């Protein structure tokens, strides 16, 4: 595959992920992941050792399933009512590509509306996508919020 075709395949998956999250299709979102994949929202924007530092989220498969369960169940006050989100993904840059792995960095502008209030969150995101047969799956997603080291409101949805 050419770098352009690898980037196109990656962006196709990334846009699908964003749409699934905004539409509340969380079970389908879980299916986009490698079983051993990691979903990370670090506090320190420069951190790379996610498993040994404090993060807003550092979710393996089990924790992603629990997060989705909370979103569907309504049992958590931070998810009731469920926030409506709309995200725009852009500025995709291919950082690495080979036959089994594609690494892409991009920007996300996410609007949340809940209980009569709208909030905006901007982030740099890095996706590590692993080829599994004829499809790509998310191996790691790191969401570096531009205001991650500031006070954040309760985020009751998946970035």
Describe the predicted segments one by one.
Residues 1-35:
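Short, low-complexity N-terminal intrinsically disordered segments enriched in polar/charged residues
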Residues 2-5, 52, 117:
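Conserved aromatic-histidine-acidic binding/catalytic patches
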Residues 8-12, 62, 120:
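A generic "alpha-helical surface" signal
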Residues 11, 65-69, 156:
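Generic detector of well-ordered alpha-helical segments enriched in charged/polar residues
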Residues 17-19, 75-82, 114-116:
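Short helix-to-loop capping/linker segments positioned immediately adjacent to catalytic or ligand/cofactor-binding
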Residues 35-104:
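A solvent-exposed, acidic/Ser-Thr-rich amphipathic alpha-helical stretch
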Residues 86-88, 93-159:
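A beta-strand edge to alpha-helix "cap/lid" segment located at domain peripheries
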